Regions:
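Short conserved AdoMet
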Residues: 51, 140, 158
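Leloir-type glycosyltransferase catalytic cores
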Residues: 185-189
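Beta-rich strand-turn-strand
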Residues: 131-155
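Acidic, glycine-centered active-site loop in nucleotide-sugar glycosyltransferases
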Residues: 158-159, 164-167
Length: 189
């Protein structure tokens, strides 16, 4: 077998195995009712960085290996879509409600060839994201900010700002002296 064909075969095999691992993660592992097992799998096989006392509930859906970091005492509730191809960084004491969608990839609509692109999403400490909110690629949610349920965040949010709507716009402010500790884990989620 020529060297080029062998390298091509190895690259294809690696891609197929990577896709199989993601399929197994999203269709089997994320249905296991044990935080310990899921978190261990994510750390070892997906190479995620997961802080202590953080929880990722069942049916969280990931799009890639690596590119995912969550700090201490943070929670991602059930059925969240986490497109980590461009990188997702989540701080400490962050609460992400059910069915939130965080996207890090899109297409350049001004490009004649519909170029795909990735941009990271950064969620700083003490952020709250309400149910079914959508966070788009390239957004930073500043420390202590809050996103209302159903909001679509298209631009970065300053610290301690509350946003709501489609597209999300500022509607208020949170206190700047936040000091709570999130320790939320349900037994079978």
């Amino acid at each position: 077998m020529p060297k080029l064909s062998c390298l091509h075969w190895l690259a294809q095999t690696k891609q197929i195995l990577g896709e199989a691992l993601l399929y197994f993660t999203n269709h089997v592992v994320n249905h296991i009712p044990s935080h310990f097992v899921r978190i261990g799998f994510y750390r070892v096989y997906l190479q995620f960085e997961i802080g202590s006392n953080s929880a990722i509930f069942m049916e969280a859906w990931f799009d890639a290996r690596k590119n995912f970091k969550i700090g201490n005492h943070s929670v991602i509730n059930q059925k969240c879509r986490l497109d980590n191809r461009g990188g997702i960084t989540i701080g400490e004491n962050v609460s992400i409600s059910s069915e939130v969608c965080i996207l890090t990839a899109d297409h350049d609509l001004q490009s004649s060839d519909f170029t795909g692109r990735t941009r990271p999403v950064i969620i700083e400490d003490y952020v709250f994201i309400g149910t079914r909110a959508t966070i788009l690629a390239g957004v930073t949610l500043g420390k202590g900010s809050a996103v209302a349920a159903g909001a679509v965040v298209t631009k970065s949010v300053p610290p301690f700002t509350i946003v709501a709507g489609v597209p999300a716009k500022p509607i208020g402010m949170r206190p700047t002296d936040l000091k709570y500790l999130i320790n939320y884990r349900r037994l079978f989620w």
